[in-house]
């Protein structure tokens, strides 16, 4: 039982790290490019030349539009799912995967390995019922 608890806690920690990495990746865009600012070393065109928007503006607009769409997707998904439920779902999934992988090697080598795997699966099912979660990965 202690091993199962430690395995579950490791899965929760892994899910938290994964969630934090995913959120930091979406905010890693260059702020100067999103704001549409130009580089300070660029030459200023004279008054005789026609005023045309630089190409970096269109790139910045595309980048900011993509960032807005990405932010909207993240916001809508967060509104739909409670973040705690999402973390619990991920940790249960990781626990089930770890138990499945452990079960492949334990059945023949360790006495009581099959019972350990069955108890771990029952534990994951109890958690699903306790938090009233559906299995989205099944």
UniProtKB/Swiss-Prot annotation:
Q: Name one GO molecular function term.
A: growth factor activity
Q: Residues of the signal sequence?
A: 1-19
Task: Tell me the tissue specificity.
Answer: Expressed in secretory granules of many acinar cells in lacrimal gland and in scattered acinar cells of salivary glands.
- SS bond partners: none
Q: By its UniProt entry, which InterPro entries does this protein fall under?
A: Dermcidin/Lacritin (IPR043557)
Cellular localization per UniProt: Secreted
GO annotation, biological process = calcineurin-NFAT signaling cascade; calcium-mediated signaling; defense response to bacterium; epithelial structure maintenance; negative regulation of apoptotic process; negative regulation of lipopolysaccharide-mediated signaling pathway; positive regulation of calcineurin-NFAT signaling cascade; positive regulation of calcium-mediated signaling
**Chief location of this protein within or outside the cell:** secreted
Please give the residue ranges the record annotates as the region Disordered.
20-79
Output the Gene Ontology cellular-component terms. Answer: extracellular region; extracellular space; secretory granule
Q: Which residues are glycosylated?
A: 119
Keywords of this entry: Glycoprotein, Secreted, Signal
Annotated PANTHER family: DERMCIDIN-RELATED (PTHR40711), EXTRACELLULAR GLYCOPROTEIN LACRITIN (PTHR40711:SF2)
Summarize the protein's role.
Answer: Modulates secretion by lacrimal acinar cells.
Q: Quote the protein name from its UniProt record.
A: Extracellular glycoprotein lacritin
């Amino acid at each position: 039982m202690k091993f199962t608890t430690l395995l579950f806690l490791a899965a929760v920690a892994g899910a938290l790290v994964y969630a934090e990495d995913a959120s930091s990746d979406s905010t890693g865009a260059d702020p100067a490019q999103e704001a549409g600012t130009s580089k300070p070393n660029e030459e200023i065109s004279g008054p005789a030349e026609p005023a045309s928007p630089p190409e970096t503006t269109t790139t910045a607009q595309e980048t900011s539009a993509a960032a807005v769409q990405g932010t909207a997707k993240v916001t809508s998904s967060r509104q739909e799912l409670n973040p705690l439920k999402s973390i619990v779902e991920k940790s249960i999934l990781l626990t089930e995967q770890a138990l499945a992988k452990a079960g492949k090697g334990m059945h023949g080598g360790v006495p009581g390995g099959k019972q350990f795997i069955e108890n771990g699966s029952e534990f994951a099912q109890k958690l699903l019922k306790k938090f009233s979660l559906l299995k989205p990965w099944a």
